[in-house]
């Protein structure tokens, strides 16, 4: 029987006790039948298996109230519904004193008049300007969805296209001569009814029309009313009782008064300066400058007083005597020549023997000094090793190349092999004996010949070694590659690219210890 009576079903033969219904309405016996309706719902509205507090209610009253409140809140919070509720015409006040162009659209950063944010309104939908002298409004449409202009039907207006090639239209009061042709040419017609005249503007079209109070523009659902800004009248225009004498003048309106005008008194209030007589005033001494013509022997340097100001640290020199010219240290008093002392190892004989005679003039003494200094500079000229090497290489190259060509060895190929071997070798410097065993061509050369060839190459440096090694043999000269003096750009680029190749140090990096660690016992 358990499968016939589930837990929520009523017990057969038991009367239903429902608080909403009277107990006499239901049958005392309920017959359980399978395959057809258990109760007649036309007579009984809601047969419930078990009584509860919410029997007969379609929903809880508390839930119903909260749902209604939520609906009203959502309706107010929705921006689209708010616009519908609060929708009204937007007013544009045109300033007669300002003929500038105003932008109308939904983007705040680029527009002067902001429209609601709707998808059918462009960011910059239109541009409007007002010309007060002609009482005309110029309207340019920049929106994709266009706009419509509505004017009150107060006067007869006609839509004209003055220029056939431009999208420019004009509303005029005079009827054009060929009205039929104009309508066919521009394809626009005025829609007239009892109250308004309206026409549509597409994107890129411009129209000028006279300002009429009560005109408005429809931006695909948003209405914009046009009005003129009220300007406060000037006090002197409408008021005839304006007192000019008692009015307050501004600074710009004040007149400048000259000192010679009658408004200024001629009495001097400032006391005049008077000289105070001094009984025993010191007499001013007149300083006379001495003549600058004097003999050079008697000229003496006077002490120079330095004057410094606290603002600057510049030294002001005021020499009272002319400055003595620096010349060669030759004194003609005893007819002797004083020369600058030379180093001890390069002392040359004095010119006392040649200048003892008193008949030598100043020009001869200068010539003698110049001759001696020239001889001294020629004897003490030091030639750098690089210059010596360059001179010797220029003289030796033809001889070496001739001797090598007789053996069938090209000089350029030999230089190329030696430079490449020293540039790309793992050793920083290579002894001469190892360079002799590079290939068959270098092995044919003797040490002296190979040394001469190496001296002619500018990008190969030499390390001269003197002495003997442990076995008693003399130490050999070692040669290295100098990249800065190399003429081959290709070898330079290849050498610089292979600079970071792996060395002995890189294989030991993984064993390097970067911090102190206590040694293990």
Curated annotation (Swiss-Prot):
Q: Report the InterPro entries cross-referenced here.
A: FHA_dom, SMAD_FHA_dom_sf
Q: State the conditions that upregulate or repress this gene.
A: Regulated in a cell cycle-dependent manner, peaking in G1 phase. Negatively regulated by transcription factor SBF (SWI4-SWI6 cell-cycle box binding factor).
Q: Where in this chain does the record put each FHA domain?
A: 102-156
PROSITE patterns from the entry? FHA_DOMAIN
Q: Where in the cell is it found?
A: Nucleus
Write out the ranges of the annotated region (Disordered).
Answer: 1-63
Q: What are the recorded GO MF terms, alphabetically?
A: chromatin binding
- What's an example Gene Ontology biological process for this entry? DNA damage response
- Gene Ontology CC, one term: nucleus
> What the entry says about post-translational processing?
Phosphorylated by CDC28.
**Which superkingdom heads the taxonomic lineage of this protein's source?**
Eukaryota
- Where along the chain is composition biased (Polar residues)? 51-63
One Pfam family name is FHA
Q: Which UniProt keywords apply?
A: Nucleus, Phosphoprotein
Q: Which family does it belong to?
A: Belongs to the PLM2/TOS4 family.
Explain the purpose of this protein. Answer: Binds to the promoters of genes with functions important for the G1/S (start) transition; primarily genes involved in DNA synthesis and repair, chromosome segregation, nuclear division and transcription.
Q: What is this protein called?
A: Protein PLM2
Organism, as annotated: Saccharomyces cerevisiae (strain ATCC 204508 / S288c) (Baker's yeast)
Per the record, the gene is PLM2
């Amino acid at each position: 029987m358990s499968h016939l009576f589930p837990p929520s079903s009523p017990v057969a033969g038991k009367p239903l006790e429902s608080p909403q219904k009277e107990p006499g309405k239901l049958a005392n016996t309920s017959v359980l039948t399978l395959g057809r309706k258990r109760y007649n719902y036309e007579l009984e509205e809601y047969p419930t298996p078990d009584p509860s507090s919410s029997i007969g209610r379609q929903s809880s009253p508390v839930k119903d109230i909260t749902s209604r409140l939520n609906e009203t809140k959502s309706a107010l919070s929705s921006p689209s519904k708010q616009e519908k509720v609060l929708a009204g015409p937007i007013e544009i006040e045109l300033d007669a004193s300002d003929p500038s162009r105003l932008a109308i659209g939904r983007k705040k950063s680029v527009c002067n008049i902001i429209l609601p944010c709707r998808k059918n309104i462009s960011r910059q939908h239109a541009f409007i300007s007002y010309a007060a002298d002609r009482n005309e409004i110029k309207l340019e449409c920049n929106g994709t969805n266009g706009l419509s202009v509505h004017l009150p039907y107060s006067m007869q207006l006609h839509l004209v296209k003055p220029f056939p090639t431009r999208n420019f239209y004009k509303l005029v009061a005079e009827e054009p001569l060929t009205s039929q042709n104009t309508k066919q040419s521009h394809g626009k017609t005025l829609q007239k009814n009892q109250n308004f005249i309206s026409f549509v503007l597409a994107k890129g079209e411009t129209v000028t029309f006279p300002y009429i109070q009560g005109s408005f523009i429809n931006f695909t659902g948003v209405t914009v009313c046009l009005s003129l800004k009220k300007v406060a009248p000037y006090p002197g225009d409408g008021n005839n009782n304006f007192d000019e004498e008692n009015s307050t003048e501004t600074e710009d309106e004040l007149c400048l008064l000259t000192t010679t005008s009658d408004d200024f008194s001629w009495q001097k209030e400032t006391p005049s300066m008077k000289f105070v007589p001094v009984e025993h005033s010191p007499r001013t001494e007149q300083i006379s400058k001495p003549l600058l013509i004097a003999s050079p022997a008697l000229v003496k340097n006077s002490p120079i007083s330095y004057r410094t100001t606290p603002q600057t640290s510049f030294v002001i020199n005021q020499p009272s005597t002319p400055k003595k010219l620096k010349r060669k240290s030759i004194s003609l008093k005893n007819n002797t020549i004083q020369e600058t002392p030379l180093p001890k190892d390069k002392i040359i004989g004095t010119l006392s023997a040649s200048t003892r005679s008193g008949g030598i003039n100043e020009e001869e003494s200068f010539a003698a000094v110049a001759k001696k200094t020239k001889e001294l500079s020629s004897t003490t000229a030091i030639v750098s090793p690089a210059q010596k090497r360059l001179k010797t290489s220029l003289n030796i190259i033809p001889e070496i190349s001739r001797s090598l060509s007789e053996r069938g060895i090209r000089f350029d190929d030999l230089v190329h092999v030696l430079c490449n071997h020293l540039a790309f070798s793992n050793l920083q410097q290579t002894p001469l004996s190892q360079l002799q065993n590079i290939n068959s061509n270098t092995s044919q050369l003797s040490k002296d010949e190979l040394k001469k060839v190496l001296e002619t190459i500018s990008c190969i440096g030499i390390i001269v070694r003197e002495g003997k090694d442990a076995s008693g043999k003399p130490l050999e000269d070692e040669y290295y590659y100098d990249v800065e003096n190399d003429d081959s750009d290709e070898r330079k680029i290849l050498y610089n690219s292979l600079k970071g190749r792996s060395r002995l140090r890189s294989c030991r990096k993984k064993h390097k210890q970067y911090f102190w660690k206590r040694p293990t016992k």
